[in-house]
Amino acid sequence: MKRLALLSTSDKTGLIDLAKSLVTEFDYEIISSGGTAKTLKDAGIYVTKVSDYTGFPEILGGRVKTLHPRIHGGILARKDLPQDVEELNANNIRPIDLVVVNLYPFEETISKPEVTLAEAIEKIDIGGPAMLRASAKNFAHLTVLCNHFQYNSYLEELRKNAGEVSLEFRQKCALAGFKHTATYDQAIATYLQEQQTTSESEKSEKEIFFLSGKKIKTLRYGENPHQYATWYQRGINASGWGASKIIQGKELSYNNLVDLEAARRIIIEFSDAPTVAILKHTNPCGVAVDETILAAYERAFAGDSVSAFGGIVALNKSIDAATAKAMTKTFLECVVAPGCEPEAEKIFKSKSKLRVLISPYFKQSEPETIKVISGGFLVQDTDDTIDNYSDWKIVTEKQPTTEQIEELMFAWKVVKHVKSNAIVVTKNRATVGIGAGQMNRVGAVKIALEQAGEKAIGGVLASDAFFPFDDSVKTAAAAGVTAIIQPGGSLKDKDSIAAANELGLIMILTGIRHFLH
């Protein structure tokens, strides 16, 4: 008796070639359902329709096609168990040797902006996962294929083993099947959960958090050469950095990607005027806004030209030739922008190892951040709060000018993306001093002011969290800073405010803290 293969796929890639090889090379008989059967018949391949094989028609508009004992009995039968063989014979059920199934494109459907809940529901596959799980469970007796990338491997397995398939290969395919159904069910559960989550309280009460990823590539190594690292994408469709275009340069490393993401989070704060951010080890070392992208780059670079060496540069406007020429004067790891002019691309070629990326995804924000801890992981909302000036409190006698408010807004946006304890000193919408990751706040203040030097005179200072004492205010005033922005909330806020008044400074309390660890 011929071996029996069941083919039922939504993605028809490679299907016809597989079916032809099964029939002509290995003497398989094929049963198939719905659109798959039509595709194969149109290609001249003899197929028995599932409804003809089971003696039961497809019903409910195709919702029920393969959910039948003649199908699942043939899949789940243990060929080495006499009782199973007897039951197959008694019920006129043939054992199935190969199941080729992939599922309705649920994730592709829900990725469409206008999709309705009813449309999404219709793309939830029922028969497909049932066959995949049954086949994967019974891998000792048959093979299951759930991806067209497996087809050639399966045929080669048959060719090198005289038409047989090794247990090792079948088990590997079974694992792929279970991963496929697990990811599929997770996508459905996540989508339905999001449909029902409407309030902040419901968001905080999710009892199960779903997280899975599809491998993009194995990276050369992790943070250090002795660490293994892999890059995954969420969902089946490439997005974010996975969908960015790499114009030139070496492959992206783990550290490159981490730094690029930090750069993206800064640059999306600035959507209008040309803005450039230069980062090193996820901390900004220079950020500037100006009338042209070249001027913004030059001022960001001047903010800390030493640290910019080997840094990551993110721009919110397309790169022109003049800016590309300026960037090639120093060693940089990566440059990313929403576009790059042809002349700029030519200039970058002189730095063949420089990674240049085009990414239109600067406006996207991941909904949450995740940190792994022993025994689990922590999930929090992304700190993408948009601060409103109307909510800020000017707590000093001296009032800010319109220009000073704009400067304080700029400094506040930048300090949000500096590791805590964080202090940023800016002037004319460019950073001139950054104190990052210090264990005490006044230490961060001193580092930022020392870096700024005389540029601090007339500048403003931003702090990601409150001042526990008034020493930071006094230190800033002594360096020539004219205005301070900070969240407030310290038991000794009054001391800091009093010091600011005494020294003629402006102080604004935002009421929002921006710790970053």
Curated annotation (Swiss-Prot):
CDD domains, per the entry: IMPCH
Pfam family, one: MGS
Domain MGS-like: 1-146
Pathway: Purine metabolism; IMP biosynthesis via de novo pathway; 5-formamido-1-(5-phospho-D-ribosyl)imidazole-4-carboxamide from 5-amino-1-(5-phospho-D-ribosyl)imidazole-4-carboxamide (10-formyl THF route): step 1/1; Purine metabolism; IMP biosynthesis via de novo pathway; IMP from 5-formamido-1-(5-phospho-D-ribosyl)imidazole-4-carboxamide: step 1/1
The enzyme's E.C. designation: 2.1.2.3, 3.5.4.10
GO cellular component: cytosol
GO molecular function, one term: IMP cyclohydrolase activity
Reactions this protein catalyses: (6R)-10-formyltetrahydrofolate + 5-amino-1-(5-phospho-beta-D-ribosyl)imidazole-4-carboxamide = 5-formamido-1-(5-phospho-D-ribosyl)imidazole-4-carboxamide + (6S)-5,6,7,8-tetrahydrofolate; IMP + H2O = 5-formamido-1-(5-phospho-D-ribosyl)imidazole-4-carboxamide
Keywords attached to this entry: Hydrolase, Multifunctional enzyme, Purine biosynthesis, Transferase
One annotated GO biological process: 'de novo' IMP biosynthetic process
InterPro entries named among the record's database cross-references: AICAR_Tfase_dup_dom_sf, Cytidine_deaminase-like, MGS-like_dom, MGS-like_dom_sf, PurH-like
Highest taxon in the source lineage: Bacteria
Family: Belongs to the PurH family.
UniProt comment concerning the protein's domains: The IMP cyclohydrolase activity resides in the N-terminal region.
Protein name per its UniProtKB record: Bifunctional purine biosynthesis protein PurH
Organism: Trichodesmium erythraeum (strain IMS101)
Upper classification of the organism: Bacteria, Bacillati, Cyanobacteriota, Cyanophyceae, Oscillatoriophycideae
Gene from which this protein is expressed: purH
